[in-house]
């Protein structure tokens, strides 16, 4: 029966005993007048290391007297016939004491062999019966366990078959009821039931289950084992039990394909744009919060607040065009104005103490004009008045500075520089620029008259007091900024395009920069940051180089610091320097 039988046999019957037990070791053979004690020795029981002895004692029984005699016999007197050993055993050792039996006959030996055989048979039969009883109990135990498992599996299979039959009946009935034939049959059966006043029996749908449970084998199986339950881990009270779950699943349309869920389009990029717009709003409001010491700071911060607002609207749609594309005519006029200023040294020397504070005043104007030009043109009209107010207040503060700074700037202006080396300039370029100037003046006589009326520079300003000079410089700054805007707008609207041969060359621009005009110095600082250009200016007709204003020297010294911030030159300062009489312009 395998290992399991041995294990169960050891458990039920105890430890197995060996055949060579102690009961077999000694046997008593009784005859009429003679008693002989023999021992049955196996090979494993023979002890080879017994002590040696020279004399062996033999026990003999006297038949007549019945007395036991002992004889000392040496090893040399013992023969092979006198040694008696058990059957089937042979040994070579002579240390075992021999037993002499001279008085036994052949008949007695046969009787003793028969008796020994019967005893062995009885003992072997007992052992065989004991093993059989153990195997019989093991077989019964196995049959009991296997029968229990088989019956339980059979009950579970029966319930499964009942569920499958019920599901098939439900599915087929549903399909038939939905078909055209089923609808007609249902109407006929319904009419018959209404006429006969009979109700439909719900158990008719489960005829197959009834037939299955009416089987004799199934009934016997369920009746014989009332405690046997099907193999499932659910209870009838649990909604997830077999029968209830089967009904719920069959009620659902399991034959229809499962509808695929619609893919939801992710709106992550839109959300990101909204988050960026919300995060940009508090940044703009933060720039608006800090307040400065004077009143004009509020106007300036409000104007700066509008700049990122406009750029945020137009970042992705369009980019602002560079001003260099639209200003070929304006650049030509700038060169002409600088020429007018170079030919008038008397006016520059008289206005020199006034321009030193104006240089510092015009620095903050650069930032405002930069934002005005880079932004859209609709903002020009709204931003003019606050900028003028800011400039006037800054001029008042700067006019109160000590005159020592003005003298220091004058000393710096009179220092010789490398500009004096370029006295001899090309006269052909001067004639070309003068001809261009005359052509532009003839085209726009009315516009120049309006600008001349607004310009009020006088060469004899030395006799006036310092207070009047400051007031005039303020008026000039406000007036020139307005006229400059009007001229720039007029040029864009009315002036025709100038041909390429009439435009100023790069060499003329470079020479203009070398003569130290404030226009060229400011323009170079801006163009170094953007596009490298060369400015040239023709020499005056009389061959004289005028002294430079302190504004020019300060621009040369601070050109590296403010070059990146200034994108365009100040139009107001250029017009103020170029305000001369027609007689001076003829030079």
Swiss-Prot record:
Keyword annotations: Calmodulin-binding, Cell membrane, Cytoplasm, Cytoskeleton, Membrane, Nucleus, Phosphoprotein, Repeat
Stretch list, region Calmodulin-binding: 149-159
UniProt GO MF annotations: calmodulin binding
Lineage start: Eukaryota, Viridiplantae, Streptophyta, Embryophyta, Tracheophyta
IQ domain mapped to chain residues: 112-140, 141-163, 164-188
PROSITE patterns: IQ (PS50096)
Motif interval(s): Nuclear localization signal: 176-183
Record field: compositional bias (Polar residues): 424-434, 495-506, 544-561
Classification via InterPro entries: DUF4005, IQ_motif_EF-hand-BS
Disulfide bonds: none
Oligomer and partners: Binds to multiple calmodulin (CaM) in the presence of Ca(2+) and CaM-like proteins.
Residue positions, PTM Phosphoserine: 79
Name listed for the protein in its UniProt record: Protein IQ-DOMAIN 31
Main location: nucleus
